Amino acid sequence: GGAGPNEIKGIKTKFNYADHGYAPTDSIIVSVFAIEMVYIPKSTFIAGDGVSTNTLRKIDNDLSVGAGQQVWDMGIVKGETGLTFKGEPIPDVYPKGFEAFYIMKHEISQHAYVDFLNTLTQEQQASRVPVKPTAADKSWAMAFGSYTNPSVYRNYIRIRTAAIADVAAIYGHSIGGTNWDRESNGGNIACNFLNWDDGLAYLDWAALRPFTELEYEKAGRGHKRVIRGEMAWGYKAGMPVAATNSFTDAGLASEVAKDPQANYLETGKAPWVMRVGAFAKDSTTRYESGGTYYGVMNMSDNLWERCVNVSTPDGRSFVPNHGDGYLSMTGTADVDGWPSAAGGGFRSFQISNRQYAELNETARHPSYG
């Protein structure tokens, strides 16, 4: 274990030109991308908190839902086979959170999404942004319609060079349209306006997979006892919230809200989106940072958490295959076994609140990521 940056040297990779359709004399650009991940170890955990809306409860080998259930109706998930949801079988391959898994430490940042867009063809780009890649240089790429006020919605991704003919667009992020430095132009702010298909495409490209709602609860609560109505940071309430649009180092890699700590939409006080992990510092506790038991950031605040539910047939059919780095010609994920419809999300900050777990929402919105 440990903390802090890593300096890894001497890494090499081999690239077979012929396997990718290139001649030995061709010049190519190879880019390396890294995503910080958190390891969630194998262990039992408790599903549901007994009080949150539509919270899970487990009696014998059957999962069900219902707020107001007694604490003893919450069940320990042990990785057993033969589980059901309201009597419907949950396939053994469906990830229940008991086995170890990796999860992204942060939400997708605007810079990470720019990196993703800049590896796609023009046809693929057109599916992953609401504004056409052929729009004028410096056009907003993600903010659209009535959502283009950057001081409110805070998505600074722009078309740096418009697509022409069959040449893809080049994207960047710039608050004013002149300075394209990522560290001073919101590159570390979570990327809002992403819909379900955008997220799946990014995961396929990054060779990752979606997580399930049971894995969401495990990543948040860990193997610890339940605190009824708890948020990801392990307390029921009392967390101060970001109350204004006022920031220190706004748009920079060091951005923090002047009114800490968590940033959740329901209060009506906070801006739509902030820098990923904005409340975590060397000196902060888990409570102050808003982190989960394992140190995953923003699981109860900032943007919606999208996951694969256990309560619908489409969700239960999920097979946890990882992406392969390639998208379809039209820019969609094409991984066998992934849900065809939106798998639901966690908007409310209690980690067992399933109010939106079955929401089939395909639109883009300032609070979706």
Q: What function would you assign to each model-found segment?
A:
Residues 34-44, 49, 292-294, 300-302, ...:
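Conserved SET/PR-domain catalytic core that frames the SAM/AdoMet-binding pocket
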Residues 44-46, 108-109, 217, 237-239, ...:
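Solvent-exposed loop/turn segments at secondary-structure junctions
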Residues 45, 108, 118-122, 224, ...:
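Acidic glycine-/aspartate-rich tracts in secreted/extracellular proteins
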Residues 46-56, 110-112, 239-242, 314-315, ...:
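Short, solvent-exposed loop/turn elements at domain surfaces
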Residues 52-64, 316-323:
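Short Gly/aromatic-enriched secondary-structure transition segments
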